[in-house]
Structures are given as structure tokens and as C-alpha cells.
From Swiss-Prot:
Organism: Staphylococcus aureus (strain MSSA476)
Protein's recorded name: 3-isopropylmalate dehydratase small subunit
Alphabetized Pfam families for the sequence: Aconitase_C
Family of the protein in this entry: Belongs to the LeuD family. LeuD type 1 subfamily.
Originating gene: leuD
Keyword Amino-acid biosynthesis: yes
Subunit relationships: Heterodimer of LeuC and LeuD.
UniProt pathway annotation: Amino-acid biosynthesis; L-leucine biosynthesis; L-leucine from 3-methyl-2-oxobutanoate: step 2/4
Amino acid sequence: MAAIKPITTYKGKIVPLFNDNIDTDQIIPKVHLKRISKSGFGPFAFDEWRYLPDGSDNPDFNPNKPQYKGASILITGDNFGCGSSREHAAWALKDYGFHIIIAGSFSDIFYMNCTKNAMLPIVLEKNAREHLAKYVEIEVDLPNQTVSSPDKRFHFEIDETWKNKLVNGLDDIAITLQYESLIEKYEKSL
């Protein structure tokens, strides 16, 4: 019973944003946290970097550059998603169009928020990220835990629980429903 779109293999366009310590307030400034729906946050992702003071696109911000338009894989620096634990940051990136984020490391809470929102966070060393950033498209194979460019393949680690959720398209509710008969049995025993 898939509740979210499963991730098995994914081929997508990349955009590099090699800043370290990108915090959740830089991903989605708190001024935009006025709704509880998961949608509608994409236009505010990286708001302070993405737009000039007059509201026009910042041409120096990589995701705004023509060669990166439509990118669905973000390759970034270390300690991505640090700061406050707002799930809105994951919502904003997902709504922007990212399906996979490759970083040197992630904040633990942000990592979990990605998986809960059907985004795959991948940890790779800097040399691997720099190599992958040379290409327009790369491919991710979650069951085999690899990220590939046309000429090289990199292995990544992921906890089996998160991998199972993403490969099978399971959210927390779908996982709970797998144990429905055991829950009902326990409730009857009370």
C-alpha cells in the first residue's frame, strides 16, 4: 500500500549549491511560514538568495541559471538543513521540485523530514559531489545505494528503515496500518 511515490531509480538534472551550513531559515525564511499546507512553499525556497531586492531573479544564484532550470537533484555542502527544526524547509524544497539532495552531511532532523516527505537525502564525500556536479544529469539507484555519472559510480549509506519507506512508498500512516491487526489485538486485550 504505497502512500507516497516510491523511489527506486531516479535520473534527474542537477544543480550545485556548494555552500556549507545552509540552515532552515536560509532554505525557507520564517516570514513565509504562515500556512500549514505542505504545498505552496516552493516559490519561497532560498528566497533571500534567489531574488534581488526588486523581486526579480538573482542571475548569480545557481538554480536561476538557464543551464540548471528544471533541476530535481540538489548537490550541496556540509551540514545542510541545520538550524531550527522546521519541516517547512523540506516542504519548500519538495515543492520547488527537488527529489534528491546530496550533501556532505545533514542535520538529523532535516534528514528525517526529507524522508518523511518523499525526498532522498544522500551523504557523499566532497570529491564525489564535485565529480557529480560536472554533469547535467546523474542517476540514483536506491535499492543498490549508488549515485552514478556517465563515467563513475559512488556508493552511499542509508538506514534500512528509511530505505524501506522510500523504496516502498510508505509514509508513517502506511507503516502503522501494516500492524493494524496487532494493534486491534492489543486493544482488545485491554
